[in-house]
Amino acid sequence: MDEVKYPVLTEKSIRLLERNQYTFNVDLQSNKTKIKNWIENFFDVKVIAMNSYRLPEKGGKRGSMIVHPIRCKRMIITLRTGDSIPLFSEQ
């Protein structure tokens, strides 16, 4: 699926792993329903809650033009107690 780009491993996302919350970068046009269905079917887990936010645009200059690259959306996915995504397992 092209809508889920990759998992995010930052200080905040590693702290959230202790609360059974996983962070992914997703496509800007994707919605929570599509992402929830894909996560539940692909990883065989139960999604309890989802939060999303857009990353801020970073301005830059290309010659005399000011450009704002398109950023992606970030989803924080909370799973049911006992479920985990093997991609983030410590083993």
Swiss-Prot record:
One Pfam family in the UniProt entry: Ribosomal_L23
InterPro entries: Nucleotide-bd_a/b_plait_sf, Ribosomal_uL23-like, Ribosomal_uL23/eL15/eS24_sf
Coiled-coil ranges (or none): none
Keyword Hydrolase: no
Keyword tags: Chloroplast, Plastid, Ribonucleoprotein, Ribosomal protein, RNA-binding, rRNA-binding
Record GO terms (molecular function): rRNA binding; structural constituent of ribosome
GO biological process, one term: translation
Family annotation (SUPFAM superfamilies): Ribosomal proteins S24e, L23 and L15e
GO cellular component: chloroplast; ribonucleoprotein complex; ribosome
Subcellular localization, as worded in the UniProt entry: Plastid, Chloroplast
Family: Belongs to the universal ribosomal protein uL23 family.
Function in brief: Binds to 23S rRNA.
Record PANTHER family: 60S RIBOSOMAL PROTEIN L23A (PTHR11620)
Record's subunit section: Part of the 50S ribosomal subunit.
Protein name listed in UniProt: Large ribosomal subunit protein uL23c
The species this protein was found in: Pinus koraiensis
Source organism phylogeny: Eukaryota, Viridiplantae, Streptophyta, Embryophyta, Tracheophyta
